[in-house]
Protein backbone atom coordinates (compact mmCIF):
# COMPACT_ATOMS: atom_id res chain seq x y z
CA UNK A 1 0.00 0.00 0.00
CA UNK A 2 1.39 3.39 -0.97
CA UNK A 3 1.61 6.24 1.46
CA UNK A 4 -1.49 8.38 1.54
CA UNK A 5 0.59 11.48 0.85
CA UNK A 6 1.80 9.98 -2.45
CA UNK A 7 -1.73 9.16 -3.55
CA UNK A 8 -2.90 12.64 -2.53
CA UNK A 9 -0.01 14.18 -4.46
CA UNK A 10 -1.13 12.37 -7.61
CA UNK A 11 -4.72 13.54 -7.07
CA UNK A 12 -3.46 17.10 -6.67
CA UNK A 13 -1.53 16.81 -9.94
CA UNK A 14 -4.69 15.66 -11.70
CA UNK A 15 -6.67 18.61 -10.28
CA UNK A 16 -4.00 21.16 -11.22
CA UNK A 17 -3.63 19.71 -14.73
CA UNK A 18 -7.39 19.97 -15.31
CA UNK A 19 -7.46 23.51 -13.95
CA UNK A 20 -4.75 24.78 -16.30
CA UNK A 21 -5.45 22.56 -19.34
CA UNK A 22 -7.24 25.21 -21.41
CA UNK A 23 -4.67 27.87 -20.55
CA UNK A 24 -1.78 25.56 -21.52
CA UNK A 25 -3.37 24.76 -24.89
CA UNK A 26 -3.99 28.44 -25.56
CA UNK A 27 -0.40 29.43 -24.73
CA UNK A 28 1.04 26.54 -26.76
CA UNK A 29 -0.90 27.57 -29.87
CA UNK A 30 0.30 31.16 -29.42
CA UNK A 31 3.91 29.98 -29.07
CA UNK A 32 3.64 28.11 -32.38
CA UNK A 33 1.91 31.01 -34.16
CA UNK A 34 4.32 32.29 -36.82
CA UNK A 35 2.35 35.52 -37.35
CA UNK A 36 3.36 36.84 -33.91
CA UNK A 37 6.57 38.80 -33.55
CA UNK A 38 9.49 37.08 -31.80
CA UNK A 39 9.12 39.44 -28.81
CA UNK A 40 5.44 38.53 -28.40
CA UNK A 41 6.22 34.84 -28.70
CA UNK A 42 8.95 35.22 -26.09
CA UNK A 43 6.46 36.94 -23.76
CA UNK A 44 3.97 34.09 -24.27
CA UNK A 45 6.73 31.56 -23.59
CA UNK A 46 7.54 33.27 -20.29
CA UNK A 47 3.86 33.09 -19.32
CA UNK A 48 3.83 29.41 -20.22
CA UNK A 49 6.91 28.75 -18.09
CA UNK A 50 5.33 30.58 -15.16
CA UNK A 51 2.53 27.98 -14.94
CA UNK A 52 2.86 25.42 -12.14
CA UNK A 53 4.95 22.37 -12.99
CA UNK A 54 2.17 20.04 -11.92
CA UNK A 55 -0.11 21.56 -14.56
CA UNK A 56 1.69 19.40 -17.12
CA UNK A 57 -0.11 16.08 -17.64
CA UNK A 58 3.24 14.40 -18.26
CA UNK A 59 4.03 14.60 -14.55
CA UNK A 60 1.08 12.37 -13.64
CA UNK A 61 1.68 8.74 -12.79
CA UNK A 62 -0.97 6.05 -13.09
CA UNK A 63 -1.57 4.19 -9.85
CA UNK A 64 -3.44 1.07 -8.81
CA UNK A 65 -6.94 1.96 -7.60
CA UNK A 66 -6.88 -0.35 -4.61
CA UNK A 67 -3.26 -0.24 -3.42
CA UNK A 68 -1.84 2.92 -4.98
CA UNK A 69 1.13 1.00 -6.40
CA UNK A 70 2.75 3.02 -9.23
CA UNK A 71 4.57 0.16 -10.97
CA UNK A 72 3.12 -2.78 -12.85
CA UNK A 73 -0.06 -0.86 -13.63
CA UNK A 74 -2.44 -2.45 -16.16
CA UNK A 75 -4.60 0.22 -17.79
CA UNK A 76 -7.43 -2.01 -18.89
CA UNK A 77 -8.28 -2.89 -15.30
CA UNK A 78 -6.85 0.08 -13.40
CA UNK A 79 -4.99 -2.30 -11.10
CA UNK A 80 -1.40 -3.33 -10.51
CA UNK A 81 -0.29 -6.75 -11.67
CA UNK A 82 -0.24 -8.14 -8.12
CA UNK A 83 -3.74 -6.95 -7.28
CA UNK A 84 -5.09 -8.05 -10.66
CA UNK A 85 -3.78 -11.56 -10.05
CA UNK A 86 -5.49 -11.72 -6.64
CA UNK A 87 -8.78 -10.43 -8.02
CA UNK A 88 -8.64 -12.76 -11.03
CA UNK A 89 -7.92 -15.82 -8.88
CA UNK A 90 -10.99 -15.04 -6.79
CA UNK A 91 -13.02 -14.80 -9.99
CA UNK A 92 -14.04 -11.17 -9.49
CA UNK A 93 -13.14 -10.14 -13.05
CA UNK A 94 -15.66 -11.58 -15.51
CA UNK A 95 -14.13 -13.14 -18.61
CA UNK A 96 -10.59 -13.20 -17.24
CA UNK A 97 -9.15 -16.68 -16.92
CA UNK A 98 -5.68 -17.97 -16.24
CA UNK A 99 -3.90 -18.95 -19.43
CA UNK A 100 -3.12 -22.61 -19.96
CA UNK A 101 -1.90 -24.29 -23.12
Swiss-Prot record:
Function: Binds 16S rRNA, required for the assembly of 30S particles and may also be responsible for determining the conformation of the 16S rRNA at the A site.
Taxonomic superkingdom: Bacteria
Database matches in InterPro entries: Ribosomal_uS14, Ribosomal_uS14_bac/plastid, Ribosomal_uS14_CS
Family: Belongs to the universal ribosomal protein uS14 family.
Assembly information from the UniProt record: Part of the 30S ribosomal subunit. Contacts proteins S3 and S10.
Keyword Electron transport annotated: no
Residue span of region Disordered: 52-72
GO terms of molecular function: rRNA binding; structural constituent of ribosome
Biased composition (Basic residues): 59-72
Gene Ontology annotations for the cellular component aspect, listed alphabetically: cytoplasm; small ribosomal subunit
One biological process term in Gene Ontology: translation
UniProt entry keywords in alphabetical sequence: Ribonucleoprotein, Ribosomal protein, RNA-binding, rRNA-binding
HAMAP family associated with the record: Ribosomal_uS14_1
Protein name as catalogued: Small ribosomal subunit protein uS14
